[in-house]
């Protein structure tokens, strides 16, 4: 019995030794700084889940400007992606280059087994997307796409109501996205130079903001591909955007539902909201947190506030880290998934084709 106190002293040490050690932060490289959404990762509060180990950006002046703004060392900056990957050996790369450049990022990362998260949309066209998909599958990497609206609690509340059958079968989705225009809101020229060029972005507002609606409607419809696409684009401000559209409406037809995507650089204010109508009820996501719901037994809309998303489902880089570390399962039906975003690119390419020809385009595309 004299040894009992000593044994009791050892118990906490034994229990501590059995506990798994905390996982180290995921080593992340940043491919490009020319997409203004890069401030999301550069200005992110420290959460201990990722560590930026390198940045690939040939524009030294831009890198220095952002280094001063966010306080990172220029020692992290490399002139190109290949040199950054070789020197820093990241586990994952976040692509904030041009949309056209997403393929190049995957071509460099996939053979090295490096996971990739691109900023929306996945690819500039279906040809690029299919090459990226093939590389991701061949080398068994994650290929994720980030959208701001993925992290809106309001959108997830609407989806829950739809999935629970509270609204009845979905009949119509109306999704509004955009702002006054990238030049009007003061986007830097390193961003607008490629954003307003069809080669590097694939189009104008139809791509920049049409992708949100394509992503959300595919998610709400549980991965179902539309049967046809009809789109109309306009150049309301050709003096500002001579190469691309600044106004787009895309109609997605499903066997028993319809989605109307209103993508614009002409809204009088910035907006990312949607209306979902079921057979017997409706739910509107007004912004990131607010929504209003009309249930079958009600004659009016009831305002609601969505609960905040819990980690790691509240942040793109937390999600990326959790998937790389395999602390959460991969969901092929999610907003970030490759499966969803292959359909998104197909919708966008069909929309561009429809707008150019004035004809309805049927899916799947060849």
Segment roles from a protein language model:
Residues 19-22, 92-94, 322-366:
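C-terminal helix-rich "cap/oligomerization" subdomain common to oxidoreductases
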Residues 62, 72-135:
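Beta-loop-alpha module in the N-terminal Rossmann-like domain of NAD(P)-dependent dehydrogenases
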Residues 36, 150-240, 358:
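Predominantly a Rossmann-like dinucleotide-binding segment in NAD(P)-dependent oxidoreductases
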Residues 17-71:
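N-terminal Rossmann-like dinucleotide-binding module
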Residues 184, 272-343, 361:
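C-terminal glycine/acidic-rich active-site capping loop/insertion
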Residues 213-292, 318-328, 350-351, 364:
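Contiguous beta-strand/loop segments that form the cofactor/metal-binding neighborhood of enzyme cores
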Residues 131-149, 171:
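Rossmann-fold dehydrogenase core element
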Residues 10-17:
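Hydrophobic h-region of N-terminal signal peptides that target proteins for export
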């Amino acid at each position: 019995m004299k040894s009992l106190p000593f044994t009791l002293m050892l118990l906490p040490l034994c229990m501590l030794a059995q506990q798994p050690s905390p996982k180290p932060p995921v080593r992340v490289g940043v491919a490009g700084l020319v997409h203004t959404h890069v401030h999301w990762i550069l200005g992110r509060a420290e959460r201990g889940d990722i560590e930026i180990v390198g940045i690939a950006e040939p524009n030294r002046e831009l890198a220095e400007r952002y280094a001063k703004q966010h306080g990172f060392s220029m020692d992290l900056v490399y002139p190109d992606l290949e040199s950054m990957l070789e020197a820093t050996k990241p586990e994952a790369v976040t692509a904030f280059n041009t949309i056209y450049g997403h393929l190049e990022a995957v071509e460099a990362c996939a053979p090295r087994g490096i996971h990739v998260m691109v900023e929306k949309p996945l690819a500039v066209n279906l040809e690029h997307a299919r090459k990226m998909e093939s590389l991701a599958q061949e080398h068994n990497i994650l290929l994720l796409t980030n959208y701001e609206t993925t992290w809106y609690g309001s959108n997830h509340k609407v989806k829950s109501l739809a999935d629970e059958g509270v609204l009845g079968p979905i009949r119509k989705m109306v999704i509004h996205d955009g702002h006054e225009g990238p030049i009007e809101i003061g986007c830097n020229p390193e961003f607008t130079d490629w954003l307003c060029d069809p080669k590097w972005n694939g189009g104008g507002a139809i791509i920049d903001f049409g992708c949100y609606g394509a992503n959300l409607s595919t998610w709400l419809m549980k991965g179902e591909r539309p049967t046809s696409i009809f789109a109309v684009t306009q150049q309301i401000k050709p003096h500002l955007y001579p190469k691309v559209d600044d106004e787009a409406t895309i109609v997605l037809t499903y066997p028993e539902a319809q989605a109307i995507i209103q993508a614009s650089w002409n809204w009088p204010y910035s907006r990312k909201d949607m209306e979902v109508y079921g057979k017997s009820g409706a739910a509107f996501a007004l912004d990131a947190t607010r929504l209003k719901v009309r249930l079958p037994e009600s004659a009016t809309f009831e305002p609601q506030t969505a609960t905040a998303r819990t980690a790691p489902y509240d942040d793109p880089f937390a999600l990326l880290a959790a998937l790389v570390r395999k602390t959460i399962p991969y969901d092929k039906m999610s907003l970030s998934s490759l499966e969803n975003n292959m359909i998104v690119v197909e919708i966008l390419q069909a929309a561009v084709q429809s707008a150019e020809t004035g004809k309805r385009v049927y899916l799947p595309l060849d």
